[in-house]
Amino acid sequence: MAKKKKVQALIKLQIQAGAATPAPPVGPALGAHGVNIVEFTKAYNAATESQRGNIVPVEITVYEDRSFDFKLKTPPASKLLLKAAGLQKGSGVPHTDKVGKVTWDQCKEIAKTKEPDLNANDIEAGAAIIAGTARSMGIDVEGRPSA
C-alpha cells in the first residue's frame, strides 16, 4: 500500500482561466508554502485553456514534501449570470434597482454548468438557487414557474 502524503495546506484561489502568472495573488499564496509556482501556473493554464475568459476557482492541496494537487471548480454563479445578462457588475441596491434580466432557461443552463458544485437534487432546484443569486445581484428572472 502506498504511503499517504501529509497535507500541509489547502489554498483556494479564483484565477482567470489560462492566464495564471506568478504575480499576485498566485505567487504569494503558493510561495508561502514553498510550492514551485511556475510548475503550478503551467499546469493550471494547460488545464483551463478551453475555458479562457472565465474565472475558474481552484483548490490547491499542498503536501509536506512541497508537492501539490489541484482541483478545478466551476466558475462562480455571479460571473455566469453577469455574462448571461450582458452586464459588467450587479446592482449596488439589488432589491430596489434592477440592472438586468435573465430568463428561467438561462438559469437552467447555468445550473447545468454548475451542477458538480451545486447542492441540489436536480436541475430545477439548481436553477432556483441560481435565480436566488440573480435576485441578490439585482437581476430579474423572467418566466420562472410558480412553486
Curated annotation (Swiss-Prot):
Signal peptide: none annotated. One of its GO terms (molecular function) is structural constituent of ribosome. It comes from Corynebacterium urealyticum (strain ATCC 43042 / DSM 7109). The gene is rplK. GO terms for cellular component: cytosolic large ribosomal subunit. Transmembrane segments: none annotated. The lineage of its organism: Bacteria, Bacillati, Actinomycetota, Actinomycetes, Mycobacteriales. GO terms for biological process: translation. One or more lysine residues are methylated. Part of the ribosomal stalk of the 50S ribosomal subunit. Interacts with L10 and the large rRNA to form the base of the stalk. L10 forms an elongated spine to which L12 dimers bind in a sequential fashion forming a multimeric L10(L12)X complex. Keywords: Methylation, Ribonucleoprotein, Ribosomal protein, RNA-binding, rRNA-binding. This is Large ribosomal subunit protein uL11. InterPro entries: Ribosomal_uL11, Ribosomal_uL11_bac-typ, Ribosomal_uL11_C, Ribosomal_uL11_C_sf, Ribosomal_uL11_N, Ribosomal_uL11_N_sf. Belongs to the universal ribosomal protein uL11 family. Forms part of the ribosomal stalk which helps the ribosome interact with GTP-bound translation factors.
